[in-house]
Amino acid sequence: MSFPYFISPEQAMRERSELARKGIARGKSVVALVYAGGVLFVAENPSRSLQKISELYDRVGFAAAGKFNEFDNLRRGGIQFADTRGYAYDRRDVTGRQLANVYAQTLGTIFTEQAKPYEVELCVAEVAHYGETKPPELYRITYDGSIADEPHFVVMGGTTEPITTALKDSYAENANLREATRIAVRALRAGSESSNGDQSALDVGSLEVAILDVNRPRRAFRRINRPTLENLLRELDSNGSDGNGDAPELNGGSSD
């Protein structure tokens, strides 16, 4: 006599968690950190068309690690939610915490009710409206719908432990854009060296970089273009130190 296959709820949740964690770890790493001018996003991403960093709304940005098709669906859903709410009420009613909560509820439902969990980890960041002095906010949302606010930085995807360790050792509050970019890239290179033994493999062509600029009047999100990033990394590679220079001028050095 054969018995029906049975798996305990605890075992099912463990297997779902393991599947999601392995999928996220296979992806490339992403760093989001607070700096003096807002929030900086730096992602390992050799693709120019499949972007891991995005604007969600006027003062809110998004970054993700894991399976592209899954987090891109979430990204587009977040944009639609924000646009609808901003149109129906007021643009200031759209906040990073609100969007992070929506993502947490969505991922939690998928994790418990669907056949397969999403293999994604998300970061939602928000900067203050122009003229306000509220500090930036970072929210990490994991595959099971867990949400946490992070005061300084978020690391997702790939080999996170060496990147997190490097950031704990080198992160500086109120760093300017130049210093923050160097801190983030050095941390990502530490992760690259840990996984494949080669820091030099992480060059400007394999990086996607953007910022939420608190000093912009309306839309804070800006992408850092390749020439500006090449200049920053050239100085980093040649000097081997963070240096004390001011942040580079972004006029003509970024794009929407």
From Swiss-Prot:
Q: Which GO terms describe its biological process?
A: modification-dependent protein catabolic process; proteasomal protein catabolic process
Give one GO term, molecular function aspect.
Answer: threonine-type endopeptidase activity
Note whether Lyase occurs among the keywords. Answer: no
Q: Which UniProt keywords apply?
A: Cytoplasm, Proteasome
Stored Gene3D superfamilies: Glutamine Phosphoribosylpyrophosphate, subunit 1, domain 1
Return the annotated region ranges for Disordered. 235-256
Superkingdom in the source lineage: Bacteria
List where in the cell it is found. Cytoplasm
Annotated Gene Ontology cellular components are: cytoplasm; proteasome core complex, alpha-subunit complex
Q: How is its activity regulated?
A: The formation of the proteasomal ATPase ARC-20S proteasome complex, likely via the docking of the C-termini of ARC into the intersubunit pockets in the alpha-rings, may trigger opening of the gate for substrate entry. Interconversion between the open-gate and close-gate conformations leads to a dynamic regulation of the 20S proteasome proteolysis activity.
Tell me which family the UniProt entry assigns to this protein. Answer: Belongs to the peptidase T1A family.
Q: How does it assemble?
A: The 20S proteasome core is composed of 14 alpha and 14 beta subunits that assemble into four stacked heptameric rings, resulting in a barrel-shaped structure. The two inner rings, each composed of seven catalytic beta subunits, are sandwiched by two outer rings, each composed of seven alpha subunits. The catalytic chamber with the active sites is on the inside of the barrel. Has a gated structure, the ends of the cylinder being occluded by the N-termini of the alpha-subunits. Is capped by the proteasome-associated ATPase, ARC.
This chain's function reads: Component of the proteasome core, a large protease complex with broad specificity involved in protein degradation.
**Protein name, entry field:** Proteasome subunit alpha
Taxonomic source organism:
Mycolicibacterium paratuberculosis (strain ATCC BAA-968 / K-10) (Mycobacterium paratuberculosis)
From the UniProt record, report the name of the gene that encodes this protein: prcA
